[in-house]
Amino acid sequence: MSTTNDNTTMQRLMITDMRPLSMDSIITSLTKEIITHKFIYLINNECIVRKLDERQATFTFLVNYEMKLLHKVGSTKYKKYTEYNTKYGTFPMPIFINHGGFLECIGIKPTKHTPIIYKYDLNP
């Protein structure tokens, strides 16, 4: 009996210790669902049509990301996720290249827990 209690206690400790990682994996998964080829295409279209500079393009990217996140998870979880993103610096940030005055988003910068993601690696 004592062995079972020790195992249960150990499992509880492991679950408690891994909470930040599980939240990070949820956010990473949501980010991969939100930021798709279509999402990047829309950002690139905005950059071309409105002739945005890098600051404006980054702002447009983040606003669109947050709106999709809010729509996907609802207001209660949205607040929790954005607080986590702010605290741990896990907001996805775009990588832009300049094509003669027009910006193109080619991917997402790496964060503390995620590698660099290029638009060709994203979901369609």
From Swiss-Prot:
<dbReference type="GO" id="GO:0039502">
    <property type="term" value="P:symbiont-mediated suppression of host type I interferon-mediated signaling pathway"/>
</dbReference>
<keyword id="KW-1092">Inhibition of host IRF3 by virus</keyword>
<dbReference type="GO" id="GO:0039722">
    <property type="term" value="P:symbiont-mediated suppression of host toll-like receptor signaling pathway"/>
</dbReference>
<keyword id="KW-1119">Modulation of host cell apoptosis by virus</keyword>
<keyword id="KW-0922">Interferon antiviral system evasion</keyword>
<dbReference type="GO" id="GO:0039540">
    <property type="term" value="P:symbiont-mediated suppression of host cytoplasmic pattern recognition receptor signaling pathway via inhibition of RIG-I activity"/>
</dbReference>
<dbReference type="GO" id="GO:0052150">
    <property type="term" value="P:symbiont-mediated perturbation of host apoptosis"/>
</dbReference>
<keyword id="KW-1106">Inhibition of host STAT2 by virus</keyword>
<keyword id="KW-0945">Host-virus interaction</keyword>
<dbReference type="GO" id="GO:0039557">
    <property type="term" value="P:symbiont-mediated suppression of host cytoplasmic pattern recognition receptor signaling pathway via inhibition of IRF7 activity"/>
</dbReference>
<comment type="subunit">
    <text>Monomer (instable). Homomultimer. Heteromultimer with NS1. Interacts with host RIGI (via N-terminus); this interaction prevents host signaling pathway involved in interferon production. Interacts with host MAP1B/microtubule-associated protein 1B.</text>
</comment>
<dbReference type="GO" id="GO:0033650">
    <property type="term" value="C:host cell mitochondrion"/>
</dbReference>
<keyword id="KW-1113">Inhibition of host RLR pathway by virus</keyword>
<keyword id="KW-1090">Inhibition of host innate immune response by virus</keyword>
<keyword id="KW-0899">Viral immunoevasion</keyword>
<keyword id="KW-1225">Inhibition of host TLR pathway by virus</keyword>
<dbReference type="GO" id="GO:0039564">
    <property type="term" value="P:symbiont-mediated suppression of host JAK-STAT cascade via inhibition of STAT2 activity"/>
</dbReference>
<dbReference type="GO" id="GO:0039548">
    <property type="term" value="P:symbiont-mediated suppression of host cytoplasmic pattern recognition receptor signaling pathway via inhibition of IRF3 activity"/>
</dbReference>
<keyword id="KW-1088">Inhibition of host RIG-I by virus</keyword>
<comment type="function">
    <text>Plays a major role in antagonizing the type I IFN-mediated antiviral response. Acts cooperatively with NS1 to repress activation and nuclear translocation of host IFN-regulatory factor IRF3. Interacts with the host cytoplasmic sensor of viral nucleic acids RIGI and prevents the interaction with its downstream partner MAVS. Together with NS2, participates in the proteasomal degradation of host STAT2, IRF3, IRF7, TBK1 and RIGI through a NS-degradasome involving CUL2 and Elongin-C. The degradasome requires an intact mitochondrial MAVS. Induces host SOCS1 expression.</text>
</comment>
<dbReference type="GO" id="GO:0039723">
    <property type="term" value="P:symbiont-mediated suppression of host cytoplasmic pattern recognition receptor signaling pathway via inhibition of TBK1 activity"/>
</dbReference>
<dbReference type="Pfam" id="PF03113">
    <property type="entry name" value="RSV_NS2"/>
</dbReference>
<feature type="short sequence motif" description="DLNP; interaction with MAP1B">
    <location>
        <begin position="121"/>
        <end position="124"/>
    </location>
</feature>
<keyword id="KW-1045">Host mitochondrion</keyword>
<dbReference type="InterPro" id="IPR004336">
    <property type="entry name" value="RSV_NS2"/>
</dbReference>
<keyword id="KW-1223">Inhibition of host TBK1 by virus</keyword>
<protein>
    <recommendedName>
        <fullName>Non-structural protein 2</fullName>
    </recommendedName>
</protein>
<keyword id="KW-1093">Inhibition of host IRF7 by virus</keyword>
<keyword id="KW-1114">Inhibition of host interferon signaling pathway by virus</keyword>
<comment type="similarity">
    <text>Belongs to the pneumovirus non-structural protein 2 family.</text>
</comment>
